[in-house]
C-alpha cells in the first residue's frame, strides 16, 4: 500500500475507546503500553502512541453507557514479547482463535505478521504486531 504523501489526505491523530472506569483504564493501559499517559478534563486519559493519541474516555461521567469501539485497534511495537508479558500479567490475552491459532499467543499470521490479541476489561479488541513484520 503506498504511503500517503498528499498533504490534503486526512491523517488520524486520535482514537477514542470508551471505558466504564477511567482510573482502572489509566492503570490498565499504562501498564500494557508501558507509559503513564496524561489525564485530561472531561473524563479522559491520553496515551501518545507514536503520533496518534489513544484517548480512553469514561462516558458514564456524562450519564452515557460505554460501548466497545472498533473491531480491533492495531499497535506496531518493537518488543512484542515485552508487551505480551505485560498483557499476560494483566490477564488480558484474547481467549478466541485467529485463523485457527490462539489469539492471545504470539503467532506468525498467514500474511507474515507476528502478533497477538488482547481484550481490555471493557471488551475492546487490541492487536500488537512486531514492527519488522507489518503488512501494509
Protein language model regions, located:
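N-terminal beta-strand motif that seeds the catalytic metal site of vicinal oxygen chelate
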Residues: 1-26, 71-73, 129-136
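Core segments of cupin and vicinal oxygen chelate
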Residues: 9, 16-54, 59-60
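Conserved positions at the start
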Residues: 12, 44, 113-115
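Vicinal oxygen chelate
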Residues: 22, 73-125
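Active-site beta-strand termini and strand-to-loop segments that position acidic
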Residues: 47-51, 118-121, 131
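Conserved beta-strand in the GNAT
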Residues: 55-57, 117, 126-129
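Acetyl-CoA-dependent GNAT
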Residues: 57-61, 108-109, 130-135
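Helix-adjacent hinge/juxtasegments
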Residues: 63-67, 71-77
